[in-house]
Amino acid sequence: MTILVMGTIKLGEGEGAKAAKLFADHAAVVKTEEGCEEYSFAFDAADPDLVRVAERWANAEALGAHGQADHQKAFGRALRAHSPSAMSIDAWDGQHWRKLI
């Protein structure tokens, strides 16, 4: 069953630009994980310190393995340097309903 993950990470003031490479490098590694179908970060157009998270995993096991991966744990530690003040990330089980565009 497909797992969708969406959320936000609010970084400290002025930290978005400083953290951009960390996010890009991490996404490149995660995209090679088995079961990763989509993994991206986007900086909000109105707030450059707000990061939007979008992920799609083939199944819950793939998402679970991702959470235990050494590079994911290292990313979490590195993220602390950018003073995250709030994080909200949720997962849903889902299936493709229809193509909109």
Role assignments for model-derived ranges:
Residues 7-8, 69-70, 95-101:
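Short flexible/disordered coil segments
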Residues 25-38, 56-90:
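An amphipathic, aromatic/His-enriched active-site/gating alpha helix that lines ligand/cofactor pockets
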Residues 2, 42-49, 77-101:
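Glycine-rich beta-strand-turn "strand-cap" elements at beta-sheet edges
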Residues 10-19:
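Short, surface-exposed ligand-recognition loops at beta-strand->loop->(often short) alpha-helix junctions
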Residues 3-10, 40-67:
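Short, well-ordered beta-strand segments in beta-rich or mixed alpha/beta enzyme
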Residues 17, 48, 66-74, 95:
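Residues at secondary-structure transition points
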